[in-house]
Amino acid sequence: MSITNKESPEQLNNPEFNNHYAENGNIINLKELKRKLPEELQAQAEELKIENVSSLRKQELVFAILKKSVEQGGSIVGEGVLEVLPDGFGFLRSPEVNYLAGPDDIYISPSQIRRFGLRTGDTVEGRIRAPKEGERYFALLKVNKVNFEDPSKAYHRVNFDNLTPLYPDEKLGLELEDNSKDFSTRVIELVAPMGKGQRALIVAPPRTGKTVLLQNIAHAITTNNPEVFLIVLLIDERPEEVTDMQRSVRGEVVSSTFDEPASRHVQLAEMVIEKAKRLVEHKKDVVILVDAITRLARAYNTVVPSSGKVLTGGVDANALQRPKRFFGAARNIENGGSLTIIGTALIETGSRMDEVIFEEFKGTGNSEIVLDRKIADKRIYPAIDITRSGTRKEDLLVDKIVLNKMWVLRRIIDPMGSSEAIEFLLKKLEHTKTNNEFFEMMKSPAERK
């Protein structure tokens, strides 16, 4: 790939140089353009009299619209997530196209990367210009923001690997008061409360409602914790489920469907985790919902070079190191910032490989939500096995009085079977609007007075 965009630092900070590309017409926001539907882009392209519109892919359409708009006197503001290539230069990839390389990517020169201390995963926003003669990509002219903050702050950040991890001590509010039909997030609050920095596994056999449960968790997080940056990562999923998730979740939804190669699954996961790490370095709270960790581990197993040592089920001995590093990145950070990862692990699929992957990940999380096939077969949702689900160090997330009531609840339902336990709890929750109201109902008449 030949890249010829070469701007010196002096040029890039020179007002006269920037004014040469200053807007005479409209400002075009590249991010908003990429969010448009293909039909809207086609209509816009036809207005600009671009030829062969129907034969162009979405990214090619965006590129053509930008180029034509600049010719007519417009200027462009762009944003994307940086991927630094081995040659030293980088490109801003877009979450709207799942960080896939395309003609509408924005080129960043090595001098800009060095000057601002940029790394893979940084979210960069700035003014961009159209490609000159002999160039293939739009180029970044001026950096306005790095990770939604002033670029100067990027100098003083501490590397993610040097940050001190702690147990989660601030609870993620998952309880939705207005949700009278679905009690899944209220049940999670009672049996396995989540905190900022949690590393949680949803252990799920097929057809137990794990994807719907993830959607409910995502909805609860965005409603109750607006300060949290939410990313939903779908690996090896069906395209219709991706569309459903994009339409139901207010957050960043990125996906690599089952018809894409394993290398694409891995590249997407690496971009997402690097982006999350850079945001945590800026003391932000990030939540990643992964569906599914098992399929991600399968993808790593496919792309990793063979070590010659193969475990049971066909898993290479070195294959699980990188997915473990992905999952292990979840942590609560001392002095601000946290990365929470809630991932689904598939079991009872009939694949020995999936069982081996689950066993490897079993002890790495600090919270587990176990879904039961027998409960789901009775069409009871959420199909959570209460006795087998729980969170480590939950005393740091809830106060002592509530914790004692949670323990009393566990003692009451322990003699019951898994189906009877969740049915009993759901019937009680139906009569109350909040979990606090539910705990009040648990009190004896003497305690209520």
From Swiss-Prot:
Spans annotated as Disordered: 1-20
SS bonds (residue pairs): none
Keywords from the named record: ATP-binding, Helicase, Hydrolase, Nucleotide-binding, RNA-binding, Transcription, Transcription regulation, Transcription termination
Binding site for ATP: 195-200, 207-212, 238
Any GO BP: DNA-templated transcription termination
Any one GO CC term of the record: cytosol
Keyword Transcription regulation tagged: yes
Pfam family, one: Rho_N
Residues in Rho RNA-BD domain copies: 75-150
Any GO MF annotation of the entry: RNA binding
EC number of the protein: 3.6.4.-
Polar residues: compositionally biased ranges: 1-17
Free-text function comment from the UniProt entry: Facilitates transcription termination by a mechanism that involves Rho binding to the nascent RNA, activation of Rho's RNA-dependent ATPase activity, and release of the mRNA from the DNA template.
Subunit structure and binding partners: Homohexamer. The homohexamer assembles into an open ring structure.
UniProt cross-references to NCBIfam families, sorted A to Z: PRK09376.1, rho
PANTHER family: TRANSCRIPTION TERMINATION FACTOR RHO
Family label: Belongs to the Rho family.
Protein's UniProt name: Transcription termination factor Rho
Source organism phylogeny: Bacteria, Pseudomonadati, Pseudomonadota, Alphaproteobacteria, Rickettsiales
